[in-house]
Amino acid sequence: MPSLSPRLLDLIAAIDPVDHGHDPAGQAHLDNLTKPRGSLGRLEDLALQLHRIQGGARPLAADPARIFTIAGDHGVAAEGVSLFPQEVTRQMVLNFLNGGAGINVLCATAGIDLRVVDAGCLGDDFDPHPQLIRRKVAPGTANMTHGPAMTREQCEAALLLGADLAAQAAADGCRCV
């Protein structure tokens, strides 16, 4: 089996495990908020995870933040497993770029920078747009019912794309991606 690229191995090696030593203080803070314990469900889990990632710092620093909406077509759509036809991917990307999707409302409300990444949409390139990042790994994935959806190289390219996007966001001053 071929090995991972040195760059990907270096990125993986640089990932520090989260420190659970701050969990009691983080959980105590969540439990002392004016709300029933655990009533925020998954949001409380996310807050505790951010608390760990930031080494127990309070308040949590998530501003400025950026969300990457990464778009691509899936070959398995040919099997009729999707609620919508493949063409909807392109329509949704245009909707994101024109500010007409739910993610746009959430980002605008929270003051979060939204970027749309074409990592594998079928068809022609999208017209330039300030929120669009064109980084196609492939023109869609293959149909996983007939074989692997991605090659090993495509998978690695997709992982490195995510790392590149996170690094650029950090360089731009984002504290949360």
Predicted regions located by residue number:
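N-terminal loops that bind phosphate or other acidic moieties
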Residues: M1-V177
